[in-house]
Amino acid sequence: MAKDFLLEVGIEEMPARFLGPALTQLKEQTVKTLQELRIEYADIQTYGTPRRLVLYIKDLAENQAALEKEVKGPAKKAAFDAAGNPTKAILGFTRSQGVSMEDLVVRSIGQVEYLYALKREEGRPTAQVLAEICPGLIAGLHFPKPMRWGELELRFARPIRWLLALFGEAVVPFELANLQSNRFTYGHRFLSTGDLSIANPEDYFTKIRGAYVLIDPAERKELIWQQVQELATAEGGVVEKDEDLLDEITNILEWPTALCGTFDEDYLKLPGAVLVTPMREHQRYFPVVSNEGKLLNKFIAVRNGTRAYIEIVTAGNEKVLRARLADAAFFFEEDLKQPLASKVNGLQKVVFLEGLGSIADKVDRIGAMADHLAETLGANEEQRENIQRGALLAKADLITNMVYEFPELQGEMGREYALRNGEAPEVAEAIFEHYLPRFAGDLLPETLAGSVLSVADKMDSIVGCFAIGIQPTGSQDPYALRRQALGICHMLIEGNIHLSLRELVQWAYQGYHEGVELKQDLNQVITEIEEFFKQRLKGILNDRGLSYDTVDAVLTAGFDDIADVVDRGMALAAFRELPAFAALMTAFNRANNLAKHATTTQVQEVHLEHSAEQELYGLLTKLEGEVRPLLEQKNYALALQKIATIQSPLDTFFESVMVMVEDEAVKTNRLALLKKLVGLSMNVADFSKIVVETK
């Protein structure tokens, strides 16, 4: 008969970011362990709060499934003597395996027969197995910053304070961290007193809820959002759903109750970011805005408790926020006493990265590279002036009071101060936009100046890090180089900006000169960064639904122009839907295999002996004239359609002409013809990478 199993690990409050990954690990480890141990179950769920991790297994079998296995023994011919009697070899084997001669079977491996012992290992009681595996399931959880406590060797998110383990109504006995498992748990730290004796897993869920603990993070999150929306509506406003903030609040409490507070309307004169950042980032409050999106002097907080004394709690939150906003207002006013441009010289004292100079050096490099980009993209004089001014001021807000106190406001405060200093709106916007995108799914720059500065800034960081040997490895990417590379890719793709990746790397590399010692030469850096971007592009193309072989085909054909890669990939994906595509690929792959032997693409008409090759050459010459302009216009869909028209004459060519003939001149000419044909398609994709499914 199956029983439910419950494991609860009671701990001191852990950081919010630890909870989700811990519950995922706990479930995955349990699934893997039970599978290896042959213990069946109906369902596994994990729950948790900052004070507890809970594992619940529904209908866990009372015993392991029996294990039947075969153990290879000696060859049959070595197991019996001439009279058919067992030899010492087989007797020793049966004795070592604990089986009799009747438990042996014959199995053939190639031409040789071997004796195998049939063994059956009966399953052990699940209760015994659970007692053995529970310590490992808990100790096997990994946290970003585990800690030790007391004299223990165990490392965990926070000190473990109790262990509850029940299989049905029985305690599963084990010891960990000098604690013995039992049937006792504890409710909310302040709303529940004393321990709770749990009869069985079902009893746990009833009693823990009665002790003001909602153990299901999904339920807490839903309840919090519902309360927040109701309070915002009651105040005539709305709250923008911030998933990160919502998740963080969900994971720092056990019994959520939302409340609405207010602050002085005078603070609404400050820029919105100056108010929202302290609320969200420091106090974990939800700002309330009007239906038109205008910030109101309201905020919504969530307490870990009931509505008892809610007025006092609200007043306390208002007092704390009032102090935060007063500080922010002071910093803002102090920053305005000097123009943003006056901060630029101070950047010489701010280190960019050890070995790569100061932020002032980086600003100079960004300006130089931005000028290359502006010229390449055909920016007019006014645009180039705005780009250079934006480059000069891009990092100036790093040494303002506001950004020192709230680093996440870099760029936003630079834009605000630039506007108040009378800088051109295009310059101010570029200061903000050069940080975009900051994370997956973030905004992209909308202005030319913002895009140029963003690409220059990010490429400078990527090239500098690669040049001194700092590269992302595995899950480690301390300088967010992957994110910055993805940002460049998305900007170029979405903005339809056509630039050479190789030139970008060269320009950035050349910006590092006096006082900077680079460990790798330019060619090394180009090679490594090209591969780095290639991997990012693979992910982008896969996310757009392109098959792996379509991705390989377009990337093999080249990816120096990043925006161009996506255009070619989407055109090829659509081209693959044509009914005749498979037949075309068959012909092209045959041509490609032969073209590998070619040493030239120069076709000598005098050696075109057969009408089929003459017809193919004539059509190819005509197609080159039609396709080249389409490629220049990046009209890859039409270019591929034109290329497809060569299938029929190509099929005729292969049916009528022998390529690898003895006449060297004729053979060379035919190979050149095929190489020329394959080269035309290589402007879009390498068709040899396409996998054609045969039916």
UniProtKB/Swiss-Prot annotation:
Reactions mediated catalytically: tRNA(Gly) + glycine + ATP = glycyl-tRNA(Gly) + AMP + diphosphate
Domain of life where this protein originates: Bacteria
InterPro entries linked: DALR_anticod-bd (IPR008909), Gly-tRNA-synth_bsu (IPR015944), Gly-tRNA-synth_heterodimer (IPR006194)
UniProt key word Cytoplasm: yes
Transmembrane segments annotated in the record for this chain: none
Main location: cytoplasm
Subcellular location: Cytoplasm
GO terms for biological process, alphabetical: arginyl-tRNA aminoacylation; glycyl-tRNA aminoacylation
UniProtKB keywords: Aminoacyl-tRNA synthetase, ATP-binding, Cytoplasm, Ligase, Nucleotide-binding, Protein biosynthesis
EC assignment: 6.1.1.14
Cross-referenced Pfam families: DALR_1, tRNA_synt_2f
GO CC annotation, single: cytosol
Keyword GTP-binding: no
GO MF assignments: arginine-tRNA ligase activity; ATP binding; glycine-tRNA ligase activity
Quaternary context: Tetramer of two alpha and two beta subunits.
Family label: Belongs to the class-II aminoacyl-tRNA synthetase family.
Protein name as catalogued: Glycine--tRNA ligase beta subunit
Source species of the chain: Desulforamulus reducens (strain ATCC BAA-1160 / DSM 100696 / MI-1)
Taxonomic lineage from the root: Bacteria, Bacillati, Bacillota, Clostridia, Eubacteriales
